[in-house]
């Protein structure tokens, strides 16, 4: 370690892979583990995550590029986060990103428009910010308006029926 003259990160590949195996075992392989690329956008780590069976959660065009370069199946790339521009969404759809997380009704409509123009049915995951106040917690993302998800009170009874009319495919709803 003395030969390095600057700070660096040291990863133990075996411990990392063992941790991933344990997570899969604990879930009886019923989950899809996603590695958040923004946590450490290194090509080698992304390739390691792919080899271990993880999908990648990305939040920018650069991270989409990195995931594809790492050889991750496009269906296992999940694009999430607020602030996606029309160019970000176009890029994600053009590159064949597996699922795009929807953070607002406007974003849902934008994804639909881009997908329609490209004659693609785009899978989406709709993130809902529930109108629920937790008791006893100091910090909570529920019960307050947030850039992360669609506020529950914005949704009407026909919201999910209307989604079926769009050129998108709802892969699920998350709180």
Language-model regions, residue ranges each:
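Residues in well-ordered beta-strands of folded domains
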Residues: 80, 127, 149
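Active-site loop/helix belt of alpha/beta enzymes
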Residues: 130-175
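Glycine-rich, aromatic-flanked loop segments that form ligand/cofactor-binding clefts
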Residues: 121-133
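A charged N-terminal "starter" segment
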Residues: 1-100, 105-122, 167
């Amino acid at each position: 370690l003395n030969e390095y003259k600057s700070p660096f990160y040291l990863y133990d590949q075996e411990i990392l892979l063992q941790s991933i195996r344990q997570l899969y075992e604990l879930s009886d392989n019923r989950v899809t583990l996603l590695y958040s690329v923004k946590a450490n956008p290194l090509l080698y780590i992304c390739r390691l995550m792919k080899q271990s069976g993880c999908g990648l959660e990305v939040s920018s065009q650069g991270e989409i590029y990195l995931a594809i370069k790492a050889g991750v199946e496009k269906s296992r790339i999940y694009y999430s986060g607020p602030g996606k521009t029309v160019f970000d969404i176009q890029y994600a759809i053009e590159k064949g990103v597996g699922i795009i997380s929807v953070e607002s009704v406007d974003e849902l409509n934008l994804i639909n428009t881009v997908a329609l123009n490209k004659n693609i049915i785009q899978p989406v995951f709709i993130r809902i910010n529930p109108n629920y106040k937790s008791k006893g917690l100091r910090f909570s993302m529920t019960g307050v308006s947030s850039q992360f998800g669609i506020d529950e009170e914005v949704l009407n009874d026909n919201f999910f029926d209307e989604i079926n009319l769009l050129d998108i495919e709802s892969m699920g709803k998350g709180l």
